[in-house]
A protein has these predicted regions:
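Intrinsically disordered, low-complexity segments enriched in small polar residues
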Residues: 6-7, 11, 23, 27
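Short, flexible helix-loop junctions that flank or precede catalytic/ligand sites
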Residues: 1, 12, 22, 31-287
Length: 287
């Protein structure tokens, strides 16, 4: 009779990523690229997408690439792994076992004179320096970082050892995002927001609707909440003076940035998601 295993145990969580062709011409990410990133009017520089694992960063990058993909542009990606096959785009999967890491792949592709470079993730200083050098020599560079907010990405780059003047001269925009569960319109129910919730979250400053309504119900699908930091002269000046993330965020808000928390509250008021869901994914980030 087999004896139960005791003591040391193992746990395996497989993550199956079938390589497939991307179908990214619809949905909130496509609208975001069209309305928001293009608003920054940048052709060169570094655009970063930041957020925790599972927040949709890679999908956002793929959507951006599908928007940028034209016959006139040469686009090369370095990824780990290649999650979607994008027609007309050269995609490289890193293989550390044979010595092909992000930095090595990037050193190779910059010699191929691409117009756009997508780096799956900036993981170390060497990769970051090559990305910066690429942007300084006329390439648009897209990549991701793991930080809690757009402003925190700047301090993360500083902590990695990147000089402040290089960040100021190369980073064009940073998008932070989270995914929230979307309320199912078939089961969604509106209710009047209690006064304590209105006061706690400042809901009366975000909508002119009276009474103020929130929504609850079952969930179906997901939606993104985002904050977009576009580099401007004030931010560059603060960066050169080594301002912290909070100071950078305050300056970005004066220029029109909506924090993840505020954007989430607006979606809750619009019935896209519930207040509870917004608080779940943004707690501690401007809440």
């Amino acid at each position: 009779m087999a004896q139960p295993i005791t003591g040391v145990t193992a746990s395996i969580t497989p993550k199956i990523r079938p390589v497939r062709r991307a179908s990214l011409k619809r949905g909130f990410l496509c609208v975001f690229i069209a309305r928001r990133w293009r608003r920054s009017h940048v052709d060169l520089g570094i655009l970063l997408v930041t957020g925790p694992t599972g927040s949709g960063k890679t999908t956002t990058l793929y959507t951006a690439l599908s928007r940028l993909n034209t016959a006139e542009r040469k686009i090369i990606t370095v990824e780990d792994p290649v999650e979607y096959q994008l027609e007309g785009i050269n995609q490289i999967q890193v293989k550390p076992a044979i010595g092909l890491d992000f930095a090595g792949a990037l050193r190779s592709i910059v010699r191929q004179d691409p117009d756009v470079i997508m780096i799956g993730e900036i993981r170390d200083l060497e990769t970051c320096r090559i990305a910066i050098q690429s942007s300084l020599t006329g390439h648009l560079v897209l990549s991701t970082l793991h930080t809690n907010s757009a402003a925190a990405s700047i301090t993360r780059l500083l902590d990695m050892g990147v000089e402040s003047y290089l960040i100021a001269s190369t980073v064009s925009g940073i998008l932070a995002q989270r995914l929230v569960r979307r309320l199912d319109p078939a089961t969604r129910v509106a209710f009047e927001a209690p006064p304590e919730l209105i006061a706690e979250h400042g809901l009366d400053r975000l909508t002119e609707q009276r009474p103020i309504l929130l929504y609850r119900g079952g969930y179906h699908g997901r939606s993104a909440i985002t904050e977009l930091l576009v580099m401007n002269d004030e931010l560059r000046g603060l960066l050169m003076r080594h301002a912290d993330a909070a100071t950078l965020e305050q300056a970005a808000r004066r220029a029109g940035l909506r924090t993840l928390h505020e954007e989430g509250l607006r979606q809750a008021l619009a019935g896209v998601t519930s207040l509870e869901e917004v608080l779940r994914v943004t707690r501690g980030e401007g809440a």
